[in-house]
Structures are given as C-alpha cells and as structure tokens.
Amino acid sequence: MRKEDCFYLGKIAKKFSFKGEVLVYLDTDEPEMYEDLESVFVEVNKNLVPFFIENSNLHKADFLRVRFEDVDNEEEADAIMNCEVYLPLKMLPKLTGNKFYFHEVIGFEIEDKRVGVFGKIVSINDTTAQPLFEVLNGEVEMLIPMIDHFIVKIDRENKKVVMDLPEGLVEMYL
C-alpha cells in the first residue's frame, strides 16, 4: 500500500499495558467510526506495514486502545511507538456539497467570484488556528483562509473551489 492511497488516522502515542497494548491518538472528529477496525497500516521505517487488530475500544475522547496481533509485550510495543497510523482512502465516507477532505482539493483550481481563477491549491496548512489553502499562482505562493462562509462551492467535477473572498485579499498577492 502506498502512502498516497491512504489517509492519516493518527499516531501510536503511548503504551497501555505490559502485554503490548497501545493507545493510538485519533486525529478525527468522529473517533467512534474507527472503533471496530480489523487492521491499519503503520508507518515503520518509511514503509506502510499492515497490522491486524485483535481488540480495540475507545479510550477517553481521542484515543483508541489497541491490541495488535503479534505485539505481545512492552518491547514490541516500543518498536512502534510514535509511528503514524493510516487507512486506505476508500474507507473514507464520501462527502458532498461544500464539505471536503483536505487531500481531496489538492490540485484544484481556486476561483474568487470577483477576480476569477487565481491559482491552484498545492497544499493545506492546518498547523495554524485557521486552516489555510496554500495556492500557487505562477511563482507567487498565496495563503487563503479556509473559512466556511467564504466557500461558495466545491466543484468536484471541474476540480475547482469557488470562493467569495474579502476585497483586496487576492489582489495583495498579485
């Protein structure tokens, strides 16, 4: 399985028991969707390795307590500590309307109602308080806030995000 064909689910955060159980931090708004997984991909030495789940249940708000097959003690759990966890993209529920997954709009054109098409989305910066579209217009990199009421339409068919941005925001980059 290639990383490009997967989505980031979370990270193995800490050991839970001396029998190899671990807590996986789930980077999701709906952790209950992932309570009954049969397997996940764990990134070990830059390779996605399938890990089969013997048992799992939610632990507190954002953690999944997991017992993997063939991880039977603390030493084996240590070997996968802090590793990232992935699932195949096909496991994501389809979104419609103006709801979208960040990875889904990478490569889409971005258009403002007044200015027209002004670039292509190359990345999403979600390390800030407000996620940002990272847009490339020729050599110019632009940061456009991903605010719901700015988004007019996610046009999946034409691979375009249409926005109604505050006057001057796009122009300050051009």
Swiss-Prot record:
Pfam families, sorted: PRC_RimM, RimM
Location(s), subcellular: Cytoplasm
Sorted UniProt keywords: Chaperone, Cytoplasm, Ribosome biogenesis, rRNA processing
InterPro entries linked to this entry: PRC_barrel-like_sf, PRC_RimM, RimM, RimM_N, RimM_N_sf, Transl_B-barrel_sf
Keyword rRNA-binding tagged: no
GO molecular function terms attached to this record: ribosome binding
GO biological process terms, semicolon-separated: ribosomal small subunit biogenesis; rRNA processing
Alphabetized NCBIfam families for the sequence: 16S_RimM
Similarity comment: family membership: Belongs to the RimM family.
The protein's role, per its UniProt record: An accessory protein needed during the final step in the assembly of 30S ribosomal subunit, possibly for assembly of the head region. Essential for efficient processing of 16S rRNA. May be needed both before and after RbfA during the maturation of 16S rRNA. It has affinity for free ribosomal 30S subunits but not for 70S ribosomes.
Record-given protein name: Ribosome maturation factor RimM
